[in-house]
Amino acid sequence: MTSVDTMPPPMVRLESQPDDLMGSSDVADVSDLLPGHTNGLEDEVKIPATNGLKSHPVVTTGTEKTGVMPPLQPESKKNNKGVPWYHASPNDIDPVTRGLLENYSKIPSDQVQQHVIAIREKAWDVYPYPCIGQFLFLNLTINLSPYYPSLVSRLRDQNQTLLDLGCCFAQDVRKLVSDGAPSQNIYGADLYGEFMDLGFELFRDRKTLKSTFFPTDILNERDLLLKGLDGEMDVVYLGLFLHHFDFETCVKVCTRVTRLLKPKPGSLVMGVQVGSLVGDTKPIPIPSGGILWRHDIASLERVWEEVGALTGTKWKVEARLERGKGFGEKWQLEGTRRLGFEVYRL
């Protein structure tokens, strides 16, 4: 494939394969996803397309093998709503998000609150993340970056590509599209395919959004779905994602992310996560316990120094610690902040 700046927008051809990799009858051949390019894979790779289709099974190898964040609650109490991060209703809905739901999704103003509550209840049954319980998916994050206007320009005017990794409902994808980014150049992936399917319910765009979504496990090296995009992305977005890992696993995740990017200066990793005034390892204050790393700016810079040493590349980190909704709650550790970042390949 030639430069993405000169190629036509990627298209997805659906076909029926009852026994495909994901166990679903609706998939897209990666050779059509990125025309004329199969990334050197010997096996045929198929990326399940959730555009207007049913939800797909989760791709995971289990927390013992991958180091993915452990369950937040015992399986027998998975639907427990007596935890401090479960809110019965949103205290308020961010005006930007409300505008997206009313103008992009055409949901009447007086129906927005009940609509998001209904979607949240379904999502809670999938996996009770704090961001689900607190309705934090209603707080768009990608547009908080000072780089956001330039990002929209790259996608809209330069025909560049973006992968939202750990996209949940892909709410930030919808923000990009509403601001003029071509939806066919944007991809989304999450451990839970159900979340991406609920995104279509939340935004009511199943028949119009041309983005491609697929379930994936970033730490599963055998995941051919993700390998199908290696070397093809101009930007990878990590929204509320990296705080799920300890320091060593974070280095491993970021190293894997670099393989998704085009190997050239200007390729970009950007995102937001739970951070801390002092980067350290602490037990996370949830019933399952666990030891995860809370980054400050210096520790995030160390991650990318190690990534650079492992890959023979150089990266520039721009980051900031901020207060934000859902950060600094009473049940969280002292010093919790929102950590936003952009990491540029030099």
Swiss-Prot record:
Keywords: Methyltransferase, S-adenosyl-L-methionine, Transferase. Gene3D superfamilies: Vaccinia Virus protein VP39. Disulfide bonds: none annotated. Residues 1-22, 52-88 are annotated as: Disordered. S-adenosyl-L-methionine binds at residues 190-191, 217-218. Its EC number is 2.1.3.-. It is an enzyme of class 2 (transferase). Pathway: Secondary metabolite biosynthesis; terpenoid biosynthesis. The keyword Transmembrane does not apply. It catalyses: 4-O-demethylbarbatate + S-adenosyl-L-methionine = proatranorin I + S-adenosyl-L-homocysteine. GO terms for molecular function: methyltransferase activity. SUPFAM superfamilies: S-adenosyl-L-methionine-dependent methyltransferases. Belongs to the class I-like SAM-binding methyltransferase superfamily. Homodimer. O-methyltransferase; part of the gene cluster that mediates the biosynthesis of atranorin, a depside of polyketide origin that accumulates in the cortical or medullary layers of lichen thalli. Atr3 methylates the carboxyl group of 4-O-demethylbarbatic acid to yield proatranorin I. Atr3 is also able to methylate the atr2 product proatranorin III to produce the final compound atranorin. The first step in the pathway is performed by the non-reducing polyketide synthase atr1 that produces 4-O-demethylbarbatic acid composed of two 3-methylorsellinic acid (3MOA) moieties. This is O-methyltransferase atr3. It comes from Stereocaulon alpinum (Alpine snow lichen).
